[in-house]
């Protein structure tokens, strides 16, 4: 299924609301947004508002977030693709250290872009944020030596409700940057590495997820 990597140039258009610039429906997928906060810097350092409910509401994104999460991962770690089946979550994600390639896959029944993916590079330098609505699977790959990743959620984590998809499902066709390897019919990380020979590192659970066609039948 078709997908794309997020490439914002200075010429791309976005809606500026207060201290944020919002690009909506990125990749042609309704609801996905890339948010760029205004960064005020000088020779002392910088300041920015990492989240403003007022600015988000003015941009039409008034989301009642209830939980903040933070993770640290080393290079080559791939987490995903995750979703909650009965308690779907909207997520606002960003990298506060290092760099990650962050991906969302549309799982909404009846969506014109069902099965389509979109990816964006989130780094401590570009400070971009990725808003992923309910009804998407989410995952990310760490490209730096380490990365710290933060995200806001509008529902709580329910361990017994977690679902997932194979990160390398050929029907979805995510183009994970710098990953070398050949699909062997499962989500196993065996035989996969980054181009510098760093092994791809997935949890045991994430190597057991099935393909989108095996997981959903509408």
Task: Outline where the language-model segments fall.
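Intrinsically disordered, low-complexity polyampholyte segments enriched for Lys and acidic residues
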Residues: 10-12
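Short beta-strand His + acidic residue motifs that chelate non-heme Fe in jelly-roll/DSBH
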Residues: 130, 138-143, 151
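Cationic, low-complexity basic patches in intrinsically disordered or flexible, solvent-exposed regions
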Residues: 7
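Non-catalytic, conserved peripheral segments adjacent to functional cores
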Residues: 4, 14-125, 144-146, 153-218
């Amino acid at each position: 299924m078709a997908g794309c990597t997020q490439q914002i140039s200075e010429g791309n258009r976005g809606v500026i609301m207060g201290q944020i610039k919002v690009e909506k429906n990125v990749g042609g997928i309704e609801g996905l947004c890339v948010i760029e906060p205004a960064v005020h810097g000088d020779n002392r350092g910088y300041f920015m508002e990492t989240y403003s409910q007022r600015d988000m509401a003015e941009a039409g994104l008034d989301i009642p977030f209830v939980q903040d999460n933070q993770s640290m991962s080393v290079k080559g770690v791939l987490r995903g693709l995750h979703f909650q089946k009965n308690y779907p979550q909207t997520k606002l994600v960003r990298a506060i250290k290092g760099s990650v390639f962050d991906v969302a896959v549309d799982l909404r029944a009846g969506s014109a872009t069902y099965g389509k993916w979109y990816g964006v590079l989130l780094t401590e330098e570009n400070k971009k944020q990725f808003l992923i609505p309910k009804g998407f699977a989410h995952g990310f790959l760490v490209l730096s030596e380490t990365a710290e990743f933060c995200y806001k959620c509008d529902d709580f984590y329910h361990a017994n409700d977690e679902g997932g998809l194979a990160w390398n499902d050929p029907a979805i066709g995510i183009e994970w940057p710098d990953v070398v390897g050949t699909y062997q019919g499962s989500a196993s990380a065996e035989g996969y590495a980054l181009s510098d020979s760093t092994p791809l590192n997935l949890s045991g659970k994430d190597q057991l997820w099935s393909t989108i066609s095996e997981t959903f039948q509408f």
